[in-house]
């Protein structure tokens, strides 16, 4: 892991983190990507899948089932799969199942057995993660949780959910946590907060293609983590402009949770205010390849290459754009047009000029598109019917979280918005590495060419050249049936307190 600490202007310091110590950003990305392709991590992916009654609409649950089944073809025998379903109650469907050929059939049967019914009890689902996750330092598997829901948790409170998530993060500090909202009716603020606290990503999906893209991105991310759950310890007077979770420590310092560093991904730049040359900043994480902890104490650089300064300036401006996006969201949803529309419009013009002046990069272009989107929303204001305004609000929440955290897939509108003239491909993330993009593309190809619950001849999976995985045939789906008898997996929990 490489950590470079430098100042971009008076009072503003940047910490640039990357998975390799290679000199330039381009060389680091190429070298790390090659290493990830040659030796991807063995993983344990824990899926928390909402199967409440509303998941039956628009084939939501079927899309998830099809994507999960296609994902099996991407997993190797040393990858493990856990599945927790939840509605009014939660249930461990599968726990720590290695992806051997025989086990794949068992997993397919259990996936196909899921039926939509009941309410949405996320707290119960989180309570069962303890039952399937491996304790820290007992395995070389990279572990991650993916929670998918289409609604609001109507059993338990937001505080219950975040408290339970924080407990999981304390007990299992290496665990990554991604959230996925299906459609526009989910609780964007909650899923965004959970992704921030879990040092993961917040994604929104609206159909089969989106589900495949996001699942591929999350799984590909787990396969290529080089350093897990990286965090920085800063003095109490230091404030971050970035969007990561921050918690006070007993000694008065604070921990900023950056999360995982993927091989082959862009560098992560944390923007800090108030840090001086005399202050101590510690960077901690775990080397996934060795399982050994790593600690760095970077010193403020006196001479900084221009390409490094460019990344720092971009990160600083990005933080300002994310703050602006959240303020526009507050304007759309707040009473009486607060904050002020005229002031926001003026800020948009100034920010657009600031971003345009930056060195041209895919991230800079993305920031310009988001500013244009915000200006459109400011000009049109509230829409009729109100669900369109709610949709825009959720979109801004998710885009701000994705850009602020620097991971995940931007949600797409699929032509639902009357002002949607954005021709950007929503399935291409500027934050994903080649492995993640290949995984997403592979899942999109297999789910698109093999309709779920359609009897047809078995077809080979579309090859994933970058992944170099063993190819397994896609078998015709089986009729829904009761899961195989497995007493240890039939527990349910409706009231976890």
Where are the language model's segments positioned?
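Exposed acidic/Ser/Thr-rich ligand/metal-binding surfaces
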Residues: 2-231, 276-277, 419, 487-492, ...
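A structural detector for beta-sheet-dominated domains
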Residues: 6-8, 18, 235, 284-286, ...
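Glycine-rich, charged/polar anion/phosphate-binding loops
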Residues: 215-219, 254-257, 268-269
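Short aromatic-acidic-glycine turn motif
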Residues: 237-245, 290-292
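Extracellular adhesion/glycan-binding regions together with long Ser/Thr-
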Residues: 244-264
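Low-complexity, intrinsically disordered segments enriched in Ser/Thr together with acidic residues
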Residues: 261-278
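Long, acidic serine/threonine- and proline-rich intrinsically disordered regions
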Residues: 275-497
């Amino acid at each position: 892991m490489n950590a470079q600490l430098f100042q971009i202007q008076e009072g503003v310091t940047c910490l640039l983190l990357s998975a390799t110590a290679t000199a330039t950003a381009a060389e680091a990305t190429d070298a790390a990507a090659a290493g990830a392709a040659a030796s991807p991590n063995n993983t344990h992916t824990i899926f928390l899948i909402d199967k409440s009654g509303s998941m039956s609409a628009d084939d939501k649950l079927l899309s998830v089932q099809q994507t999960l089944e296609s994902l099996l073809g991407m997993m190797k025998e040393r990858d493990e799969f856990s599945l927790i379903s939840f509605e009014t109650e939660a249930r461990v469907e599968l726990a720590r199942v290695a992806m051997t050929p025989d086990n794949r059939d068992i997993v397919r049967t259990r996936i196909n057995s899921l039926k939509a019914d009941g309410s949405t009890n996320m707290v119960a689902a989180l309570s069962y993660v303890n039952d399937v996750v491996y304790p820290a330092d007992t395995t070389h598997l990279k572990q991650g949780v993916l929670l998918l829901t289409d609604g609001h948790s109507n059993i338990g409170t937001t505080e219950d959910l975040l408290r339970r998530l924080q407990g999981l993060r304390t007990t299992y500090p290496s665990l990554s946590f991604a959230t996925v909202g299906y459609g526009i009716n989910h609780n964007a603020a909650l899923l965004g907060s959970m992704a921030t606290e879990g040092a993961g990503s917040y994604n929104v999906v609206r159909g089969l293609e989106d589900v495949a893209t996001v699942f591929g991105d999350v799984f590909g991310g787990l396969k290529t983590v080089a350093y897990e759950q990286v965090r920085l310890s800063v003095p109490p007077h230091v404030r971050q402009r970035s969007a990561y979770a921050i918690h006070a420590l007993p000694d008065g310092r604070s921990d900023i949770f950056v999360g995982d560093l993927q091989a082959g991904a862009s560098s992560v730049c944390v923007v800090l205010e108030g840090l001086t040359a005399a202050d101590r900043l510690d960077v901690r994480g775990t080397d996934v390849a060795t399982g050994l902890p790593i600690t760095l104490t970077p010193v403020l650089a006196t001479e900084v290459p221009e390409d490094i300064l460019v990344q720092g300036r971009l990160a600083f401006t990005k933080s300002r754009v994310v703050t602006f996006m959240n303020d526009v969201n507050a304007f759309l949803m707040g009473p009486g047009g607060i904050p002020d529309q005229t002031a926001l419009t003026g800020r948009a013009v100034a920010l657009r000029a600031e971003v345009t002046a930056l060195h041209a990069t895919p991230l800079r272009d993305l920031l310009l598109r988001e500013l244009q989107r915000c200006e459109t929303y400011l000009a049109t204001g509230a829409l009729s019917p109100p669900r369109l305004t709610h949709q825009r609000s959720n979109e801004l929440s998710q885009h701000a979280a994705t850009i602020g955290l620097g991971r995940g897939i931007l949600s797409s509108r699929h032509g639902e918005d009357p002002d949607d003239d954005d021709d950007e491909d929503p399935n291409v993330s500027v934050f994903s590495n080649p492995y993640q993009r290949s995984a997403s593309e592979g899942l999109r190809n297999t789910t698109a060419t093999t309709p779920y619950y359609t009897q047809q001849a078995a077809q080979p999976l579309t090859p994933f050249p970058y992944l170099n995985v063993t190819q397994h045939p896609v078998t015709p789906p089986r009729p829904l049936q009761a899961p195989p008898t497995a007493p240890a997996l039939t527990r349910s929990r409706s009231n976890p307190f």
